[in-house]
Swiss-Prot record:
There is a cross-link at K69 (Glycyl lysine isopeptide (Lys-Gly) (interchain with G-Cter in UFM1)). It comes from the Eukaryota. It comes from Osmerus mordax. This is Ubiquitin-fold modifier 1. CDD domains: Ubl_UFM1. One of its GO terms (cellular component) is nucleus. InterPro entries: Ubiquitin-like_domsf (IPR029071), UFM1 (IPR005375). UFM1 precursor is cleaved by UFSP1, promoting its maturation: processing of the C-terminal Ser-Cys dipeptide is required to expose its C-terminal conserved Gly residue.
Length: 91
């Protein structure tokens, strides 16, 4: 069975730490998301993985499909950084 390797960067940390993960192609991408979130100590249930171009990745596919569609360099963002609704106070 072939493996795919991802370099996943935590974008919410100014130091931009990253982890390199190698998983079998058939691994559900939800498992990759969960493992990466645990490695960075962020909540998996409220995190998203995006491409370097900012395109969100649907985790309901295999790691092999994600690798073929989006490549190996990805970013994980915790929910508090996703969509970022700010509070606007009018003067």
């Amino acid at each position: 069975m072939s493996k795919v390797t991802f370099k996943i960067t935590l974008t919410s940390d100014p130091r931009l730490p990253y982890k390199v993960l190698s998983v079998p192609e058939s691994t559900p991408f939800t498992a990759v998301l969960k493992f990466a979130a645990e490695e960075f100590k962020v909540p998996a249930a409220t995190s998203a993985i995006i491409t370097n171009d900012g395109i969100g990745i649907n985790p309901a596919q295999t790691a092999g499909n994600v690798f073929l569609k989006h490549g190996s360099e990805l970013r994980i963002i915790p929910r508090d950084r996703v969509g970022g609704r700010g509070l606007y106070l009018s003067p």
